[in-house]
Regions:
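The catalytic Nudix box helix
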Residues: 38, 55-90
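Short, well-ordered strand-loop elements centered on a beta-strand within folded domains, enriched
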Residues: 1-5, 31-40, 124-128
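Acidic, metal-coordinating catalytic segment for phosphate/diphosphate chemistry
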Residues: 1-31
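Local beta-strand/beta-hairpin segments that build beta-sheet-rich folds
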Residues: 1-3, 90-93
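Residue-level structural signal for beta-strand termini and adjacent loop
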Residues: 7-8, 42, 66
Length: 176
């Protein structure tokens, strides 16, 4: 935490470093070992509209704890009532990019606390926050990784964060 409070829009206009949370929802499959739940961002989002993204993500509000922010974002975006102990912390990811959306520059510099959530999730039971999420879908982990790498699917997923998740899944799959 920097001790400096900025509104989200200001942080992205100035490119200020800020804290976020990233939650990856995964389940076992027979193909490569895992599926990841992807969200398709709303067409009205201020950045990367209509692109596929990780399961859930958001800013850490001033005064909030990181883990409570992760739990809040899962509830707000997907309607998932996760318990803090169900979120597996896997590390911090630094992400940065600049792009123009709707004729305005968007500058993102974030330190993301990354979590994996492995509790059962049924798409038909999710309550999507329409302002944020247009749709969700399961995709095989390796297929998704390849599409992100090749750029054959519109997305805003960091490849190096994808690798972080893969390393975590490799470690925990030994006990499967």
């Amino acid at each position: 935490k920097t001790g400096i409070v900025r509104e989200r829009v200001v942080a992205h206009r100035e490119g200020s470093l800020h804290a976020t949370v990233h939650m990856w929802i995964v389940r076992s499959n027979e193909k490569s070992g895992y599926d990841v739940l992807l969200q398709k961002r709303s067409q009205t989002k201020d950045s990367n509209p209509g692109s596929y993204d990780i399961s859930s993500a958001g800013h850490v509000d001033a005064g909030d704890e990181i883990l409570e922010s992760a739990v809040r974002e899962l509830k707000e975006e997907l309607g998932i009532e996760a318990k803090p102990e169900e979120l597996h912390y896997i590390g911090v990811h630094y992400g940065a990019f600049e792009a123009e959306f709707y004729g305005k520059m968007f500058r993102d510099r974030e330190l993301s606390s990354v979590y994996v959530y492995t509790e059962p999730v049924e798409i038909e039971n999710l309550k999507l926050q329409k302002e944020e999420v247009e749709a969700v879908r399961w995709m095989d982990y390796e297929e998704c990784r390849q599409k992100v790498h090749d750029g054959t699917m519109p997305n805003c997923i960091y490849e190096d964060e994808f690798r972080m998740v893969g390393k975590y899944l490799d470690r925990v799959s030994v006990g499967r």
